[in-house]
Swiss-Prot record:
Required for maturation of ribosomal RNAs and formation of the large ribosomal subunit. It comes from Drosophila mojavensis (Fruit fly). The keyword Nucleus applies. Keywords: Coiled coil, Nucleus, Phosphoprotein, Ribosome biogenesis, rRNA processing. One of its GO terms (biological process) is maturation of LSU-rRNA from tricistronic rRNA transcript (SSU-rRNA, 5.8S rRNA, LSU-rRNA). This is Pescadillo homolog. Belongs to the pescadillo family. Residues 525-536, 553-562 have a biased composition (Basic and acidic residues). Residues 454-469, 499-524 have a biased composition (Acidic residues). The keyword Flavoprotein does not apply. The modification Phosphoserine is found at residues 453, 457. InterPro entries: BRCT_dom (IPR001357), BRCT_dom_sf (IPR036420), PES (IPR010613). It comes from the Eukaryota.
Length: 631
C-alpha cells in the first residue's frame, strides 16, 4: 500500500484557488465572476489557510473544489464561450465593413437562459420568498436609474414593471405589516405565505452621476439580470394564488372609448397600472375578501396547547382589524408629498386615495370633493382649507400602521412639531437604550411621568402650592374668629346650659380623681404582665445595614477578573470579543442617553426663553395700555 504524500488528502484537496478554477473552466475572469453570481457560488474561508494552500503563506481567493466541479456541468459555460466567438467574428465583420454579415450575426446573438438556474437554486416557492429581500431592494433601486453606460434602459424599465406588479399584489392581498421612513428610504415589510419580506424603496431624488467609480455597476447588473427572472416567476405564482390575471389587466369597464384610450391603449393601461390606484382584473367573479372560519374555543381548550392556539387566534383577529385600518377614509395627497409610498400604504389597509391630476395620471377625485376625510400636506400653511377634513403630515399614516390603530391627528397638524418616528423593526425587550417615547407605547402610565419632568409642570405645581397656602391662611383666620366668638358667648352665658362654671369645675374634679385611681390600678396590672412576658421572650433592636457601593463594584470587578482567568486558552479570543461587544453596547447606550439629556435641556431652555419673551411682551403691552389710559 502506497503511503499518501503531503497535501494529497484532507483540507488541501477540499479547496481550489481562483486561478486554478479559471484554468479548469477555461473562462476569463469576468465570465467566471458572472457564472459564480448566477449560480450562487462564493469564495470560502478555510480553517487552516496554510494547509488549504498546500504550504503557501500568501493569501489567495479559495473556492470549494465541489463547487467548481459543479460549474463544469453548467450549460451557461458554453454560452459564455459562444460570446467570445461572437465578439471575434462580429469584430472581424466590422473591421472589413461587411455590414450584411454583421447584421445577420447580431440577429443570432447568443442569449443566456436562466430559468433552470432559478428552479435549481429555489426548489420550493417558500425558498424563493425567503430570498426575496435583497431581490426587491436591488430592483427598486435600479428602477430609479436612467440609462447609464453599464445599465441599459430596457433593464431599468423591466425592473420598474416587475416592482409595480409586486406592489399590486401587496395591495390586493393586504399583506403589508410594517412601514418606516429613514435616510436610506422607505422600509416596507409584508407577510407572504407566512414569510416576512422586507425591502427598501429609495427616496425620489434626481439621479446624480458619480465622478469616481466607487460602485461596480457591472457586477450589480449581473445580480439584477438574475433577480428579474426570479421576481417574474414569483409574481406569476403570487398572482395566480389570488386569481388575478397575469400580466396585470384592467376590467373592460375601465377601458371606455375616449381620447386617451383611442390614442394609445397600451400606454394608457401602463400609466394606470403604475398609478396603483385601480383594481386589477380577476379570473374569477368573486372579489369579496375571504372570511376566516370561526373556531370553537371550547374545543380548543380541551387541547394541551390551548393557550398557544388562543394566542394565535387573537393575533389573527388583530391582523384582520389591521387590514381594514383605513377602511371608510378618503385621502387626498398634495403635490409636495411623495405619492407612491403613501398610495401603497393607504390602499393596502382599505383606504381610498387620490391626488392632483396634473401630478400623475390615475387620480379618481379632485381636492374639492367634500367627502375627503384627510388631506396629506407637507407645508407649513395652506391658502384654502376645508372644515370637513383633517390636514395632516405624512408621518401620521406611517405611525398609525406601526401602532395598528388610528392615532389622534392633533399632533400631526400643519406646522406642528412631529413626535419621534419610532422604528417597528427593533425588539422591544432588547437590553440596549430605549427612548422614553417607545417605553410610553408599551406602558402608557409612563407618559404622565415623562410629561411632569418639564418646567411647565414645575411652575404649575409652584403656583398651585402658593394658592394652597393662601387658602390655608384664610381658613385659619376664619377658624380663629369663630373660636373667639364661641368662647365669648360661653363666658357671657355661663356655659351652654346656664350652669355655673365653679360648680361644674368641682364636680369634674371629683369625678376625675376617681377615674385616675382606677386607671392607675389598671396600669399597674399591665406593667406586671409585660414584665412577665419580657422575661419569657426578649427582642433586640435591629441595625440598618448600609451598602457600600464602592465595595460592591470592586467585588463585581474581582469576580469578573476571576472569570476571565478561568477561561480556557482556546476560548480567550471569543471571550475578549464578547467583552468588546458588551463594552461597545454600553458606550453606545451611554452616548444616546447623554444625547437625549442634551436635547431635553435644549428644549427646556427654548421653552423658558419663549415664556420670558411672552412675559416681556405682555408687560410692555400692559405698560403701553396704562400710558394710553393716563393720557
Amino acid at each position: 500500500m502506497r503511503r499518501p504524500k503531503k497535501y494529497e488528502a484532507g483540507e488541501a484537496t477540499q479547496y481550489i484557488s481562483r486561478r486554478a478554477a479559471l484554468r479548469k473552466l477555461q473562462l476569463s475572469l469576468n465570465d467566471f465572476r458572472r457564472l459564480c453570481i448566477l449560480k450562487g457560488v462564493y469564495p470560502r474561508e478555510p480553517k487552516h489557510r496554510r494547509r488549504a494552500q498546500k504550504g503557501s503563506s500568501e493569501i489567495k481567493i479559495l473556492y470549494h473544489t465541489k463547487d467548481i466541479r459543479f460549474l463544469l456541468h453548467e450549460p451557461i459555460v458554453w454560452t459564455l464561450r459562444d460570446y467570445k466567438i461572437f465578439a471575434k467574428k462580429s469584430g472581424r465583420d466590422r473591421a472589413i465593413k461587411d455590414f450584411r454579415n454583421l447584421k445577420r450575426r447580431l440577429a443570432l446573438f447568443p442569449e443566456i437562459k436562466l430559468d433552470h438556474i432559478v428552479k435549481e437554486r429555489y426548489p420550493t416557492f417558500i425558498d424563493a420568498l425567503k430570498d426575496l429581500d435583497d431581490c426587491l431592494t436591488l430592483l427598486f433601486l435600479f428602477s430609479t436609474f436612467p440609462s447609464l453606460h453599464l445599465i441599459p434602459r430596457e433593464q431599468s424599465n423591466l425592473c420598474r414593471r416587475l416592482t409595480i406588479e409586486f406592489l399590486h399584489y401587496v395591495i390586493a392581498s393586504k399583506s403589508l405589516r410594517k412601514v418606516f421612513i429613514s435616510i436610506k428610504g422607505y422600509y416596507f415589510q409584508a407577510e407572504i405565505k407566512g414569510q416576512k419580506v422586507t425591502w427598501i424603496v429609495p427616496h425620489y431624488y434626481p439621479f446624480k452621476p458619480q465622478s469616481r467609480q466607487e460602485v461596480d455597476f457591472k457586477v450589480m447588473s449581473i445580480f439584477v439580470e438574475f433577480y428579474t427572472i426570479m421576481l417574474g416567476f414569483t409574481n406569476y405564482r403570487l398572482y395566480h394564488g389570488l386569481n388575478l390575471a397575469y400580466p396585470p389587466q384592467f376590467p373592460s369597464s375601465m377601458l371606455q372609448d375616449n381620447e386617451e384610450t383611442l390614442k394609445d391603449e397600451t400606454s394608457f393601461v401602463s400609466e394606470r397600472i403604475a398609478a396603483l390606484n385601480f383594481e386589477l382584473l380577476r379570473t374569477d367573479k368573486v372579489q369579496e375578501d375571504e372570511e376566516e372560519p370561526d373556531i370553537d374555543m371550547e374545543l380548543l381548550e380541551q387541547d394541551g396547547d390551548s393557550k398557544r392556539i388562543i394566542k394565535m387566534k387573537q393575533e389573527a383577529q388583530e391582523i384582520a382589524r389591521l387590514r381594514n385600518l383605513f377602511k371608510g377614509l378618503k385621502f387626498f395627497i398634495n403635490r409636495e408629498v411623495p405619492r407612491e409610498p403613501l398610495v401603497i400604504i393607504i390602499r393596502s389597509f382599505g383606504g381610498k386615495v387620490s391626488w392632483d391630476s396634473s401630478v400623475f395620471s390615475g387620480s379618481t377625485y379632485d381636492e374639492s370633493d367634500e367627502t375627503i376625510t384627510h388631506q396629506i400636506v407637507d407645508r407649513p400653511s395652506l391658502s384654502t382649507q376645508y372644515i370637513s377634513r383633517d390636514y395632516i403630515q405624512p408621518q401620521w399614516v406611517f405611525d398609525c400602521v406601526n401602532q395598528r390603530q388610528l392615532l389622534p391627528t392633533n399632533k400631526y397638524f400643519l406646522g406642528e412639531e412631529l413626535p419621534p418616528h419610532l422604528s417597528p423593526f427593533v425588539d422591544a425587550k432588547r437590553d440596549t437604550y430605549v427612548p422614553p417615547e417607545e417605553k410610553a407605547l408599551h406602558d402608557p402610565s409612563l407618559i404622565e411621568t415623562h410629561a411632569q419632568s418639564d418646567d411647565e409642570s414645575d411652575e404649575e405645581e409652584a403656583a398651585q402650592n402658593e394658592d394652597d397656602t393662601v387658602d390655608q391662611e384664610l381658613l385659619d383666620a376664619q377658624l380663629q374668629r369663630a373660636y373667639q366668638q364661641e368662647t365669648a358667648e360661653y363666658k357671657k352665658y355661663g356655659g351652654p346650659d346656664g350652669v355655673n362654671e365653679d360648680e361644674e369645675d368641682t364636680d369634674d374634679d371629683f369625678d376625675g380623681e376617681q377615674e385616675s385611681d382606677e386607671e392607675e390600678e389598671e396600669l399597674d396590672e399591665k406593667t406586671k404582665r409585660l414584665q412577665e412576658e419580657k422575661k419569657k421572650m426578649s427582642v433586640q433592636s435591629g441595625k440598618v445595614h448600609k451598602v457600600n457601593k464602592r465595595q460592591l463594584h470592586k467585588a463585581e470587578v474581582d469576580e469578573h477578573r476571576l472569570q476571565a482567568r478561568m477561561v480556557k486558552p482556546r476560548h480567550r479570543n471569543l471571550f475578549r470579543k464578547l467583552i468588546r461587544e458588551k463594552q461597545s453596547k454600553e458606550k453606545e447606550e451611554w452616548l444616546l442617553r447623554k444625547k437625549r439629556r442634551n436635547i431635553d435641556n435644549d428644549t427646556k431652555e427654548a421653552k423658558k426663553l419663549v415664556k420670558r419673551e411672552a412675559k416681556k411682551a405682555a408687560a410692555a403691552a400692559a405698560a403701553a395700555a396704562s400710558q394710553l389710559g393716563v393720557k
